[in-house]
Amino acid sequence: MPIGSSTRRSRALTGAACLSAVLTAALTGCGTSAEQAAPPPAQVPAAPPAGRPAAQPERADRQELNAQASAAQREAAAQRRVQTARRWGLAAVPLRAPAAPSSRPELAEGPGVKRTAGLPPVVYRVPTQDKVVFLTVDDGAEKDPEFSRMLAELEVPVSAFLSDYLARSDYEYFRRLERQGVAIQNHTVNHPDLRRLDDTRQQQEICGQQDRLEREIGTRPRLFRPPYGEYTATSLRIAAGCGITAVPLWNEEAFADHLEYRYADQRLHPGDIVLTHFRGPDSWKGTMTDMLRRFLDAATAQGFAVARLEDYL
């Protein structure tokens, strides 16, 4: 083959190869550039419809409005409590009790609790570290509507231990108290000294009042307070037999014109049970609302809230 022909053919092949390489490089370069410039449509975030704000700012605005409304409600409630306390002549707004314990404290033998195997515990002071005390009202002689209203407006939790011979003249008064949150408990039928009664009479006094209160109020008491704070082992056994689980006594007593303390320091203590009575001017130097005002002011001044006894016993 002539050298000249071979050379021309070689140059033609070389030119074709170069052209192919150039075209391949151009195509590859164009493809890469297009991918970098325009991501797939799925990667582009969709714009919100015209005239509609983004979701996150709307949610934040709603949360802010809710927080402002809640704060306003709390402030209004606090102002109502101040006004109510003033209306009833209190020196300060009563303190709010903490949330009720998730379970009742164990009532082991101790300074404020007496235990006898198989019998309901006798409790003078509930074992708790909470700065709370408990108000209990005995008998049922005075049926003061202002006392009922004061309890309701100030939201004071109270336990009423009723004796039938005094309560029976107007059980409707105590039904109204129960409907507004007062717990109704047992204080015997006729308020006798149980130590002087035989088993049969004690049964009639304790379990008879259980039956009466269940019939009149609609609930069967769990708590029993013996008259004068006096009882025997037989009293506790009979009480347990008709549904009693604890026997709360007391450490302090509230009157219309003063408080009586059990201990020399003359102060309330966490878990103290306070006794008072359904009494009025015929028996006291004042009214039941005077008694409640004095007691609440003393508790508040000493840093105590009034809690519901049945949440702890």
Where are the model-predicted features located?
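Acidic-and-aromatic substrate-binding clefts and catalytic sites of carbohydrate-active enzymes
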Residues: 140-143, 162-170, 193-200, 225-231, ...
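Active-site beta->alpha N-cap acidic-glycine motif
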Residues: 94-186, 190-193, 212
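Structural recognition of the beta-strand scaffold that forms the well-ordered cores
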Residues: 133-137, 158-162, 183-186, 222-225, ...
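N-terminal low-complexity, Pro/Thr-rich disordered segments
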Residues: 18, 28-124
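C-terminal domain-boundary segment and adjacent tail
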Residues: 118-128, 168-169, 286-313
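His/Asp/Glu-enriched short active-site or ligand-binding loop at hydrolase and phosphoryl-transfer sites
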Residues: 230-267, 304-311
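Sec-dependent bacterial lipoprotein signal peptides
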Residues: 1-28
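CE4/NodB-like, metal-dependent polysaccharide N-deacetylase domain
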Residues: 45, 152, 157, 183, ...
